[in-house]
C-alpha cells in the first residue's frame, strides 16, 4: 500500500497539476492586491503632497515632529514577508537597510515579516518589535498601531528618527525597494525651493498644534500604503 501510494504521488503530471494550481492561487492574490494598491495609491500620495505643501509654506514652525529631539537611535519599520521563495523580494529590503548608512548599533528594527526579522537577527540588529502577522492581511488599524509604537518612542525621546523600508509596487513585474524618512518630517528639495520664493504663511498657535493631529495621520497613511504595496509586490515576485 505504501509503495502504491508513493507511486501514485509521483505519477507524471501530478506535480505539474499542483504547480498550476498554486500559480492560479498566486494569480488571484496578485490581482486582488494590485487592485487594492492601485486604488489606494492616489489617496496616500495626496496626503504626502498635502503635508509637503503645508510645510513648504509654513515658515519656521517649531514643532517636535519637525526638529531633532536629541536621540541618536533610529527606528526602522521594515516590511518583508513571512515566506520565502519570492526571488530577491526579502533580501533586497534587508540589503537596502544594511546599506543605508545608518550605524547598526543605532538602529532599532520594527519588523513586519518573519523573513526580514530573521535576516536582521543574523546580522546582529536589535529587534524592537515583531508584528509579522500583520502582513498576512494588513488593515489600516494595523498601520495605526505601528505608528503609535514609533511615535510614542519618538515622543519619549527613545528614538530620534523614524524610517520605513518596503517594496513599492509599480506594476505586476516592476517592484522597487524604498527607504524613506518619516520623522522628523523633511521638505522635499523642490518644495524647499518653492518655500524660499514665497512669503511664509502666518500660523496661530492653534494651527501649529494641528500638526499634532495631521502628522500622525500622515505617518499612519504612509505606513498603510507601504503595507498594501508590499503585499502586491510580494505576490508579483512569486509569479516571476
What kind of feature is each model-predicted range?
Residues 1-240:
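C-terminal beta-strand-loop-alpha-helix "lid" module of Rossmann-like NAD(P)-dependent dehydrogenases
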